[in-house]
């Protein structure tokens, strides 16, 4: 178990480039299974979750070349279906929640898929019903094997249909979409997720020869084709990393230029940080965060406490609420953080309370933060990172704290952030890896 030693109280200065989007990468890499031709993917983040998925594809027989750190060439022309049925495949899939995205391409192209009860973050229940119900509606048969704790799907041929999803699940929509592009007839998905990364998947599939209408809306119409061909695809910058860097700059009173962020795909993220009183200036496709010794949380027009809540796109991504929460601890004023889409994701606040933050955990979904206005800095502490998003929030807290903090289990941070210690040290942070 690796650890970070963080010397707090150091300001950052300079510019930082954002990595490729983790959540997009998991979808795009899975989609390379839909063709036997070469698919070139650029701006791939060099992070644990993505690399584990690439290794899983290699084990399945997919040819993978990596000419540069952020570019991969995939060719799934000799997929080993026997390996997919093996215990080793299930074991590796179980350790990687993103592996569920292989189901759509596998059932669509090969008529067979299997996946275990997944791993990933310990952030409460994350239902897979949307995936299974949608793919079954296309004609697949699903059986649960209690001895393997795995779901097995089979289909001779998928057929298009109309479906109304019970939730706008991003991975659920992606899985159904990847299954539908090779199905017979027309599939209509209503209440589809429409996040930028899902739009990117649609654009990639279109460039491979798929027929998709309604990209960017919650109503997708897919006309199945016989086969897809190769393509080249470049991934968006990671909006979660953009938000994390905004939070770091605010907490450490730093001047920071965040480069090439793809502003149109950030949605309400910059505006939400401005609600906390943080100055976020757009300069072309970059974001400039000026040095601020203090920032004040806004109130609603009636004077009531500001609420920051997650919601399906175009609402605020749930992956950034931990960053908003930690940033609010040093603001002037109070805010209610409402995590609607997952429970248990706020339980890391006890570590911030130990550091001196004033937080009331109302229930598994809500926390009220009373900002200290930087009059009382957070204290250094020794902590364990429970998941990716809490991990980055704890890192931000440690960077702003007085003294030297230690964060254990930083492999959780590695799952979503590329060489974060090296990149931050280059602009003034003092982080050592043990």
UniProtKB/Swiss-Prot annotation:
GO biological process: cell division; cell wall organization; peptidoglycan biosynthetic process; regulation of cell shape; UDP-N-acetylgalactosamine biosynthetic process
Keywords associated with the record: Cell cycle, Cell division, Cell shape, Cell wall biogenesis/degradation, Cytoplasm, Peptidoglycan synthesis, Transferase
Catalytically driven reaction(s): phosphoenolpyruvate + UDP-N-acetyl-alpha-D-glucosamine = UDP-N-acetyl-3-O-(1-carboxyvinyl)-alpha-D-glucosamine + phosphate
Cellular-component GO terms for this entry: cytoplasm
Role: Cell wall formation. Adds enolpyruvyl to UDP-N-acetylglucosamine.
Cross-referenced InterPro entries: Enolpyruvate_Tfrase_dom, Enolpyruvate_Tfrase_sf, MurA_subfamily, RNA3'P_cycl/enolpyr_Trfase_a/b, UDP_GlcNAc_COvinyl_MurA
Localization: Cytoplasm
Residues annotated as binding UDP-N-acetyl-alpha-D-glucosamine: 97, 319, 341
Pathway(s): Cell wall biogenesis; peptidoglycan biosynthesis
EC number per UniProt: 2.5.1.7
The family this protein is said to belong to: Belongs to the EPSP synthase family. MurA subfamily.
Lineage, top ranks: Bacteria, Pseudomonadati, Bacteroidota, Bacteroidia, Bacteroidales
Residue positions binding phosphoenolpyruvate: 22-23
MF annotations from Gene Ontology: UDP-N-acetylglucosamine 1-carboxyvinyltransferase activity
Active site: 121 (proton donor)
Name the record gives this protein: UDP-N-acetylglucosamine 1-carboxyvinyltransferase
Keyword Secreted: no
Principal location listed in the UniProt entry: cytoplasm
Organism, scientific name: Porphyromonas gingivalis (strain ATCC BAA-308 / W83)
